[in-house]
Amino acid sequence: FGLLSGIIFVYISYNYPRKGIFTIYTIVLLLFFTLMGGAYLPWFISSISMAILADIILSVFGYDRAIPQVASWALMQLGSAAGQWIPIWFFTDRFRQDWIDKGQSAATMDAMIHYAVGIWGIISVLVVASLSMIGVLIGRKVLKKYKK
C-alpha cells in the first residue's frame, strides 16, 4: 500500500499543506475500514499516533520537501502495519487462539507468527519502510509538474 499510494500522499502534500491533513486522512481511512468490519483498537492507536507525528514533521520541516515527506509516509505506513504486528508481538498466545477460534488452522497461525517476530519482524519493518519511501520518491517524480 505504501508503494502504490505514495503518489496520493505526495499529491496531498503538494496541494493541501495544512496541519492535521494526514491525521484526518488516516481517520477517514480507518472509518471506511470500520464500516467494512476490519478495524480494531491497536490499529487505530498506532495509525493515528503515527499520522499525528507525520503531521508534526511535515508542518515543522515543510510539506513540499523530500526528506520530511519520505519520513512521514514511512511512519504512517509503519503505524498502520504496527496495528497488525502489536497483537502478535505482545499478545501472541491470545492472538493465535482468537484466530484459531475464528477458523484458522494452528499451522497457519504458527507460520504467521513466525514471520512477524524475530528477524522476520525486523525484515517486515524494513520492507514496509523502504517501499513507503520508494512510493514517495516515485510520487515526487510523477507529480513534479503539479507542485504548486
Regions found by a protein language model. Name each.
Residues 5, 9, 24-25, 46, ...:
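Alpha-helical transmembrane segments in multi-pass membrane proteins
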Residues 10-22, 40-41, 61-68:
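Membrane-helix interface "capping/anchor" motifs
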Residues 1-27, 31:
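Hydrophobic transmembrane alpha-helices
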Residues 21-30, 67-79:
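Central hydrophobic cores of alpha-helical transmembrane segments
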Residues 14-15, 34, 55, 59, ...:
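Transmembrane helix-loop junction
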